[in-house]
């Protein structure tokens, strides 16, 4: 099993971990109702996807 040769400082550890973060979900606006929605997903407000009615709006 691999073991580190030297102790890694808090500074180096935190610099490395600063890149390990969640990305924000990208939102687009629905072309029909202009509400924010996830891309490539049917709009939960009006129920359209690619200018077609695919689900009944809630």
From Swiss-Prot:
Taken from the UniProt entry, a GO cellular component term is: large ribosomal subunit
UniProt-listed InterPro entries: Ribosomal_bL32 (IPR002677), Ribosomal_bL32_bact (IPR044957), Ribosomal_zn-bd (IPR011332)
Q: Which GO terms are recorded in the biological process aspect for this UniProt protein?
A: translation
All disulfide bonds of the chain are none
Determine the domain of life of the protein's source: Bacteria
Q: What GO MF annotations does this protein's record show?
A: structural constituent of ribosome
Q: Which UniProt keywords apply?
A: Ribonucleoprotein, Ribosomal protein
Whether Ribonucleoprotein counts among this entry's keywords is yes
Residue spans making up a coiled coil are: none
State the family it belongs to: Belongs to the bacterial ribosomal protein bL32 family.
HAMAP family the record matches? Ribosomal_bL32
Q: What is this protein called?
A: Large ribosomal subunit protein bL32
Organism name: Thermobifida fusca (strain YX)
Q: What is the lineage of its organism?
A: Bacteria, Bacillati, Actinomycetota, Actinomycetes, Streptosporangiales
């Amino acid at each position: 099993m691999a073991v580190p040769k030297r102790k890694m400082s808090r500074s180096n550890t935190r610099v490395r971990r600063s890149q390990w973060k969640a990305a924000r979900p990208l939102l687009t606006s629905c072309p029909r109702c202009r509400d924010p929605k996830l891309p490539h997903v049917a709009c939960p407000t009006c129920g359209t996807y690619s200018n077609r009615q695919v689900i009944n709006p809630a």
